[in-house]
Amino acid sequence: MYGEGESEPVPEQVAQFAQEAYQLHMMECLLTVMPRLEFEARKDIVQIFVALLQRSIGSRRPTVEYVWTHPAILRMAIRGYDVPDIALNTGIILHEMLQYELLAKLFLYSDDLYRFPQYIETTSFSISCDAFKNLRDALLCHRSIAAEFLNMHYDRFFHMYTQLLDSQNYVTRRQSLKLLGELLVDRAHYATMIRYVSDEENLKRIMNALRDRSKHIQLEAFHVFKVFVANPKKTPAVESILRRNRSRLLTFLQGFLPDRTGMLAMAHPSFTSHYSHTHTRACILIGAAFSLCCTHSFACFFFFFSQTNHSLTSASISSTSLGTCTMPDGARVNALVHSAMPSTS
């Protein structure tokens, strides 16, 4: 599959090997015997899977098509997380499968998707991280497939995902909040976002996360919370909660916003790679202030869905996109934050 020494593999031999692998159901057999093999042999199996999956004939991926018609292979790769000795090996195989839209769809619509809270919560740190990474890839790498899936299976998926958001494990909670924030501000997930931020129970959960002792969890929760506030068509229940808690939220946010620049830089180093510290801080404050300003809801939505990758430039935060306000000083920021919540009157 990889050639011998420095020589390239012979295409005819690779094709013959692949055909025999399909005919003999070798992929299923290798996953079955993997727990009984030595460490180096497991690594060899991973290389075989990766090579087969990457093999192409023109625009076709024969092995991807084969796995699509033999879903037990994907199921076995997922359930490798049940066996600690091979979990990271099968995790690599699953990761390679999820690079292809067809198999990502097979993964999302599989009942085995709902085993992932167990894999993330009850396994070792390395296995938990690997399982979460594969779940994240499935939701983010193929946006149209994921959006269609979430629209069709919203209730079942978020019933599962709430388990991760409510986890007692710091890493699980932080990464789950971060992924949720990424999903909600992605244009492909607009319908899911509207449905999520219309539910008052979701708002309560995120507001509780804002009170977490961890500043990093507070930060990730804030990125989700501001989507609730920015929604121009809040449900009565959501608006009522924001109205009742307006004073406490404003007090919290006035102290929360100014000192988050350094934390954001540590969490997302690429954000500051092309901007000065002063410019970055101003951008964060502008984004936060406008995303909380109910009187600028549509400007805020423009900001969210055009800047999801934080690619901020002076043009993208002009008065055209954000109303009449320009770079705010501290007083201006406080005034904008103060207008964040619905009036209590």
Question: Can you say where each PLM-predicted feature lies in the sequence?
Answer:
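Alpha-helical solenoid scaffolds in large eukaryotic transport, assembly, and signaling factors
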Residues: 1-118, 132-151, 189-195, 202-205, ...
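Eukaryotic intrinsically disordered, low-complexity regulatory tails and linkers enriched
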Residues: 277, 281-282, 335-345
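Intrinsically disordered, low-complexity terminal segments enriched in Ser/Thr
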Residues: 45, 276-284, 293-305
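Long, repeat-rich segments with strong aromatic
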Residues: 162-234
